[in-house]
Amino acid sequence: MARSSFQKLKLLHVMNYLLQNSDEEHPITVNQMIQYLESNGIAAERKSIYDDIEALRTFGMDIEECKRGRVFGYYVASRTFELPELKLLVDSVQSSKFITHKKTASLIKKIETLASVHSAQLLHRQVFVKNRIKTMNESIYYNVDEIHNGISKNRKIRFLYFEYNVAKERQYRHGG
């Protein structure tokens, strides 16, 4: 990719870097942004970073400036989900009986991407529900989605209940 092609991606890199690495407790300096961009093969100057931050603000990102001592930094002040909301989502996923351990880990990783890397560390918590056994059935996630789709379309939903007999054959309850 030519240098000019990398330059066209600069604004996206600045946005991504701020979203992933900044929060109120961890503002990012212009020098840190320049170093990050240079590590990605993008040349940048202080003035162009200020212009990029202003463009992101015009786009609708809530980027705040703060001063710590003699150093100015920038951080994303508001996000789609605030940290307490993300904690609630993580707790709900962890305590859900019908979500497997594997899917729980996958969903939590996705939820963590909605916070800065510093805030994401606070989402690593374990919720224990006494006598709660997580399902081993990976397809239940998709079954719940199908049930929800049927309900939202006002369709009748029919279930066939069965048990396994001694010969490990399905034996339908109530005549199937």
Give the label of every model feature segment.
Residues 75-76, 162, 173:
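Compositionally biased, intrinsically disordered low-complexity regions enriched in proline and serine
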Residues 1-92:
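Short, basic/aromatic recognition patches that contact phosphate-bearing ligands
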Residues 82-167:
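Bulky hydrophobic/aromatic content
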